[in-house]
């Protein structure tokens, strides 16, 4: 039997409406689409996933007390450079970053993961500039 060598496949564009969807459950579906694990010919070392456009990221839902208790931290490397931002404030100022952060943690770390992450397009409102690619609406 010959060794299977995967070919580069033409990615499709998918549109997902995040309104009323739970953050983590939606992020896992998006990560699966980005990696291409929904395809029967999936190969771990090839970027064969789809481009994913997410709209209405500002209307995403979280369960429990996460709005007040979940805190995003980042460190600049300097003394006193630790920034802490609660989820509630992050949703108010940059709602697309919340979903991007959740999906990025579910992708592989390394060059392939960075390449896959570039295929994710998240927008706070209902409009997006990817009409020319004719993304197909996917119900999650």
Swiss-Prot record:
One of its GO terms (biological process) is translation. Transmembrane segments: none annotated. Coiled coil: none annotated. InterPro entries: Ribosomal_uL13 (IPR005822), Ribosomal_uL13_bac-type (IPR005823), Ribosomal_uL13_CS (IPR023563), Ribosomal_uL13_sf (IPR036899). Pfam families: Ribosomal_L13 (PF00572). Keywords: Ribonucleoprotein, Ribosomal protein. GO terms for molecular function: mRNA binding; structural constituent of ribosome. The keyword Ribosomal protein applies. One of its GO terms (cellular component) is cytosolic large ribosomal subunit. Belongs to the universal ribosomal protein uL13 family. Part of the 50S ribosomal subunit. This protein is one of the early assembly proteins of the 50S ribosomal subunit, although it is not seen to bind rRNA by itself. It is important during the early stages of 50S assembly. NCBIfam families: rplM_bact. This is Large ribosomal subunit protein uL13. It comes from Thermus thermophilus (strain ATCC 27634 / DSM 579 / HB8). The gene is rplM.
